[in-house]
């Protein structure tokens, strides 16, 4: 028997039944328990969501920016009031430790809504003088109906990140969460309605990739914001372009390099490498999974990492002491185990972990040990391909130019980091690394003020920061002539 009642769609400010007749189950990855049966949206349901969003968006856009800002700030207050309740739900659905969801997932989502609520009144046009009798002014107008497609690793945070700038700019959003972690987006929809967002302005349609494809191809949707894998992102982008040339934001995968130089504080470097590989059980798109270490400090760095791996507390996500939970699904577990086996076969030296955990209460969950390979080479699969799990690959380098060249030798370009005691080197190296999100002597923080997104095949566009708001508006240019009109004929 499921823990929660059947999960329906959220359209027009209320729960509604899907018309497809199909459902799918969402499972607790720590126990294998069925959390809920979820209704799959049909094409008719997507159409209903679009029409509802069009109606709601007109009402929402007609409000003043200050009025929209107040509503969004109220949503932030409710999110923070319900932080613990939402964190518990997110932990059950994702398998993340409760200590993590309490501190990060809802809080960082609320921060982004608060940030854009503050910017809603700052959406301004320009006035451009042409001559004494004529000028141009520009207006930034909302796009209309936007769609967001979320990933399974940060369900409510991603829903907040995508909806906040859209709503602040006067748009409506139809959001499709991942079918692996579909629960918390519905709670966000409830909160938006309670805060005063008009019906239809934030709709949630559940389902698999078929639903995402319907959203990407719908001619009345003006923008798609997608978070997920590169290959799926390419398909979404293709559908978006072929249907109506809609604008896209793509936050895709990565195989990010972390460069540790021989002048680094190695204790700090080891701490950074641990966070960059094992936070959220390695299921973070920006993870620094290619750890390049300068030869002279390799042995010491390996010892420090091994010491820290032994301190990881793998356990039930609901236990406050746990800091490493299961992977999000059985499919992801099998994928990660396959990469671990590949690493062994290709000659990497297994320094820690490498096995599925099956004893006791671990047996029903999707647990894999935190895994560290060393002696890795650039052509190994575990070094080339995104694993999206707790697998660190340590590589050795000799000089700065070599490290930069090898770090950039990838189709990805999401994130990169440098650990060094030389500030000049830090900036010099960062400026040559081909990545959209970079850190110096730290890793992983993505505050609301910071634009995040990738180079190369890691994405298109940015989320968060000032510039993102511009991409949820379009510019209308208006010329005004105050003097006589000069006839042409």
UniProtKB/Swiss-Prot annotation:
Enzyme Commission numbers on file: 1.2.1.8
Keyword line: Metal-binding, NAD, NADP, Oxidation, Oxidoreductase, Potassium
Residues forming coiled coils: none
Ubl conjugation is among the record's keywords: no
Cofactor(s) this protein requires: K(+)
Record field: catalytic activity: betaine aldehyde + NAD(+) + H2O = glycine betaine + NADH + 2 H(+)
Sites bearing Cysteine sulfenic acid (-SOH), chain numbering: 285
Annotated residues for binding of K(+) 1: 26, 93, 180
Assembly behavior: Dimer of dimers.
Annotated protein name in UniProt: Betaine aldehyde dehydrogenase
